[in-house]
Structures are given as structure tokens and as C-alpha cells.
Amino acid sequence: MANTNKLVAPGSAAAIDQMKYEIASEFGVNLGPEATARANGSVGGEITKRLVQMAEQQLGGK
């Protein structure tokens, strides 16, 4: 299935990809087709959590 997600900031793809692999490493998850949906989902959930944290800090001026 093709990925149809459009990035709001196209230059952010590399940074998000790097974040994905850093988080996977922290969690001990080997990303790929052999990983469970739960393991891959935990990485995606943590990415979302960290991006929300970053946005809140920027909006709050911290």
C-alpha cells in the first residue's frame, strides 16, 4: 500500500525518521516487517508524544 501522508513541513522527513530509529533503539525494537504491530505501534505512539511535547514547549515559550 502506498504512503499517501503529506508532510506539512517537507524538510522534516529526515528528522522524524531519525527520531523513529532513536526511539526504536531506546525501546529495543527492531523496526521492519518481522516486528510485531504492538512493538511498531509503541514507537509511533512515542513519536507522537514527543512531537506534542515539542509543540507545547514552543507554544508555551519554554
Curated annotation (Swiss-Prot):
Q: Where is this site: Cleavage?
A: 22-23
Q: What are the entry keywords?
A: DNA-binding, Sporulation
Determine if Transmembrane is one of this entry's keywords: no
Under the heading InterPro entries, the entry gives: SASP_alpha/beta-type (IPR001448), SASP_alpha/beta-type_CS (IPR018126), SASP_DNA-binding (IPR050847), SASP_sf_alpha/beta (IPR038300)
One Gene Ontology molecular-function label: double-stranded DNA binding
Query: Further notes on this entry?
Result: SASP are degraded in the first minutes of spore germination and provide amino acids for both new protein synthesis and metabolism.
The protein's name is: Small, acid-soluble spore protein A
Q: Which gene encodes it?
A: sasP-A
